[in-house]
Amino acid sequence: EEQEQEQEQDTKMA
């Protein structure tokens, strides 16, 4: 669950 949230933030930053 924590990993999924991290990936979502990465997409917003990109």
Swiss-Prot record:
Q: Output the Gene Ontology cellular-component terms.
A: chloroplast thylakoid
Does the UniProt entry include the keyword Chloroplast? yes
Swiss-Prot/TrEMBL keywords? Chloroplast, Plastid, Thylakoid
Q: Where in the cell is it found?
A: Plastid, Chloroplast thylakoid
Specify where it is mainly localized. plastid
The miscellaneous comment for this protein is:
On the 2D-gel the determined pI of this protein is: 5.7, its MW is: 28.0 kDa.
State the protein's name: Unknown protein from spot 118 of 2D-PAGE of thylakoid
Which species does the entry assign this protein to?
Pisum sativum
